[in-house]
Amino acid sequence: QPASRLNQILDILQSEVIITSEKYLKDLEKLGFEGKVLMLSELNAVQEDPIILETIRNQAIDVDPLYGIFTSGSTGTPKGVVVGHRSVLDFIDCFTELFNITEKDVIGNQAPWDFDVSVKDIYSGLKTGATVQIIPKQLFSFPTKLIDFLIEREVTTLVWAVSALCIISTLNGFEYK
């Protein structure tokens, strides 16, 4: 993401805390964020407290936010969208039923996890017990390698952007095997 866009998002959020990893810490420092910075590795090392977790679970309701995502913004200004638990649960119930996704499936994830399309892959896997196989982005430049990968991983379900399917089709990837 360009620094200007990230700064716009930070201005909109007015966040007091950001969770990051070592990989992005220097980028965050360049943006001039003045709030508290928590390192993901440190949070992962904290021992879980079952009592606190139970208290939080008891307070949660289905309309609580599950995630927030920023759109590209047709005006050039990013717009934040907050999606609640109930919205995702209802959608995934219908989606997995419609496409008959079960614990026997292997879902080939093409969409980045910071893009809302990945919700179908992530939560279909969580709901049904299906395996979610992350497909390395570089394979989309080599259709035969991509097809080999899908066959080797026994991928049964693809929820892809049309552009990804078009690339494979244009390069005759579906006729490969």
Which residues are covered by each model-predicted region?
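Short, well-ordered alpha-helical scaffold segments within catalytic/effector domains
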Residues: 3, 53, 89-92, 143, ...
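Short, well-ordered alpha-helical microsegments
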Residues: 3-6, 25-28, 118, 143, ...
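Active-site phosphate/pyrophosphate-handling residues
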Residues: 66, 120-123, 163
